[in-house]
Regions:
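Hydrophobic helix-and-loop "lid/oligomerization" segment in the mid-to-C-terminal part
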Residues: 1-183
Length: 183
């Protein structure tokens, strides 16, 4: 049913279609809602019942694509602002005490000590938390820099990062892990 809903010819299916058309449809329900719909589709033996489930998965994936592109556009707008002041004013991270605020400020200053940011850290409050990593990956590809995307989640600010080969993001984040609620 998922093959037909995506208008694919089952006789000409290739790895590309599985990895970049069908797979993302199955994955979208888990990203945006619950993986239950994908599981129900896999277990459904009645084709007539499977078609609406497949259509819903395709719709969720289409929504995920639109939300991802909107997040990427928002991130690019933030990065391409004219002045550093405009850029830094968009980020409002709350920390619990003055010592952490000072350490956080020093860490940001160190990362941005020259004209070019070494690591891009973006706060996109309206970004769906499950899309932060995809958006970070797209920004990393575009700017060739390690990127962290932060967004609002139920338990506070949550983030996802994507790095480049020349930068050990895990090591750098580990060095300041006491600044995070979870790491």
């Amino acid at each position: 049913a998922l093959i037909e809903v995506n208008k694919l010819d089952r006789r000409k299916l290739e790895a590309y279609h599985i990895g970049f058309v069908l797979g993302p449809c199955v994955n979208a329900s888990g990203r945006l809602e619950s993986a239950a719909l994908s599981l129900k589709l896999w277990l459904e033996e009645d084709y007539r019942k499977a078609v609406p489930m497949a259509a819903e998965l395709k719709s969720l994936n289409d929504s995920r694509k639109e939300m991802t592109e909107a997040g990427v556009r928002q991130a690019v707008r933030l990065l391409e602002r004219e002045t550093e002041k405009e850029y830094t004013d968009t980020v409002n991270v709350q920390v619990s005490d003055t010592e952490n605020q000072e350490r956080q400020k020093n860490a940001v200053e160190e990362l941005s000590s020259d004209k070019q940011d070494k690591v891009l850290i973006l706060y996109l409050p309206d970004c769906h938390e499950s899309l932060a990593g995809i958006i970070a990956g797209r920004i990393r590809e575009r700017y060739h820099k390690p990127t962290i995307v932060l967004t609002d989640a139920e338990e506070g600010v949550k983030g996802s990062g994507r790095s480049i080969e020349a930068y050990d993001m895990f090591a750098h984040l580990s060095a300041c892990k006491d600044l995070f609620d979870k790491f």
